[in-house]
From Swiss-Prot:
This is Signal peptidase complex catalytic subunit SEC11. The chain crosses the membrane at residues 21-41. Signal peptide: none annotated. The keyword Protease applies. Belongs to the peptidase S26B family. It is found in: Endoplasmic reticulum membrane.
Amino acid sequence: MFTEEIKAFRRLGFRHVLLQALNFATVIASGLMIWKGLGIITNSESPIVVVLSGSMEPAFYRGDLLFLTNPVSEQYKTGDITVYKIPGADIPIVHRVLETHDVPPKGRKAKEAGEPASQLMLTKGDNNYVDDLELYQGLQWLERKHIVGKVRGFLPYVGYVTIAMNDFPQLKYALLGVLGLLALLQRE
């Protein structure tokens, strides 16, 4: 089945295969560094997310790729589209801020130090009938620590690649295997 590939693998020699594996590892490490660098620049643990449901239609559709930032100094306003993550839930949610409340800092020392007011938020999907209170798992409001970021831009339908990879894991592993094999057998 893979006899030609095995012959090519033997013909290339150990050093060449090792060099190709090192090049492949460099590409992977570079991708991770770029991802972490984007996270630091945008102050977001996940600066790029994919819309996984239709709850934000017509603003965003399933498969849209969203670009996020999370500036510390900026307060969220009603109407902002945010991505938040509740503790215990592994999927971030993209919804619009419906209400905000500023809570002044507690204690005299905090006020004198000039700490900013903390912000509480209530969100709702544009395509949903009710707010997200039931999604908060016992919380009354979202706090700033739950927010992954504010949507700054998007690319329509580009995220369908991610959705397809998650819906069909065999496709993901097949693509990774083929890419790895091609990287090892490349003759540069």
